[in-house]
Amino acid sequence: MKITKRRRKRYGGSLGGDIFIFVVLALLGLFMIFPIYLSVIQSLKPVEELFLFPPRLYVQNITDQNFADLLATASNMWVPFSRYIFNSVFVAVVVTVAQLLFSSAAAYALSKVAFPGAKALNKIIEVALLFTSTVLYIMQYMVMATLGMIDTYFAIILPYIATPMGLFLMRQFMGQLPDSMIEAAKLDGASHIRICWQIVMPNVKPAWLTLLIFAFQGAWQITGYSFIYNEALKPIPTVMQQISAAGIARAGVAAAAAVITMLPPIIVFIFCQSSVMETMATSGLKD
């Protein structure tokens, strides 16, 4: 009984407060999941149900015709559909791993290694968080064109292997680790590389798992319209947008394309989210 009262005091202060918080969070969750639910039911509706007014929030006659039309159209493209899948998987894996490596190494240097200009670099990173990738699109194209990387995998990989958000996230977590742990490892003769990957990284597991989720989600959505013209190098999001761009007549196919495109990031999030919550609940260091 004492534990229950203590928990109520900590979270809501009263039973009514707990109920209010639960209702607000439930409504927020429904609001966030509604677009996904809408895409799924639209992809399962036959044509005659897609254009009903007022629109229905359920499917009366479930059909897979939209997915069949999508795959049939994709199979008639210039290259096999499996090639588009390979392109997206390859780009997503390379970008995700590269972001983890570069962001972790840079965050360790900025948070645990004293060197001239570290504070200025941290400020630059914080300012960079204010800009979206769209602002840098023209500059990225100019750099890729100068390097001769247009119409190659590098054109859609290099701009995303280091992001301010990933670096900021890792730096914030690493900055919470006690300096005494780093100093003890140095006294034992450990190098910065060993300290970073064998001591620091295991203790910031929630951070790099979260970074993996965000990095994969971002990499999976890369289109590279202005960078890739070779059909054999285009990722799935680009192809799906091309297929569903025929207007309102292909509303069901567009919904099916949206479902297929967002499925892998959702699966990755489901598997990694439990690990993030578990490590956040069980880990923590204090000086």
Describe each region flagged by the PLM:
Residues M1-R8:
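N-terminal Lys/Arg-rich, disordered targeting/topogenic segments
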Residues K9-D287:
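A structural signal for multi-pass alpha-helical bundles of membrane permease subunits
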